[in-house]
Amino acid sequence: AYKTVLKTPSGEFTLDVPEGTTILDAAEEAGYDLPFSCRAGACSSCLGKVVSGSVDQSEGSFLDDGQMEEGFVLTCIAIPESDLVIETHKEEELF
């Protein structure tokens, strides 16, 4: 599992994300309420931004390459590849 720190508007939370599990699924299992809509990487409701670490979001993404290079991730499809620090609730920053 990878140690993942979620920086949310209501505080900072740390959870362990099992290998192969998305950030959104792991957060929900731990009882954290993150925003989401489609759960399929096809919208930006669950958008977060990676502060440190890396994720795999190759399952298909609403984001373009430039947005991904800036660190934006869709938590519903993003699977940690290392320990992570991620800011959640970032949808309004995209537009």
From Swiss-Prot:
Coiled coil: none annotated. GO terms for molecular function: 2 iron, 2 sulfur cluster binding; electron transfer activity; metal ion binding. GO terms for biological process: electron transport chain. CDD domains: fer2. Its cofactor is [2Fe-2S] cluster. [2Fe-2S] cluster binds at residues 38, 43, 46, 76. The keyword Iron applies. GO terms for cellular component: chloroplast. InterPro entries: 2Fe-2S_ferredoxin-like_sf, 2Fe-2S_ferredoxin-type, 2Fe2S_fd_BS, Beta-grasp_dom_sf, Fd_pln. The keyword Chloroplast applies. Residues 2-92 form the 2Fe-2S ferredoxin-type domain. Binds 1 [2Fe-2S] cluster. Belongs to the 2Fe2S plant-type ferredoxin family. This is Ferredoxin-1.
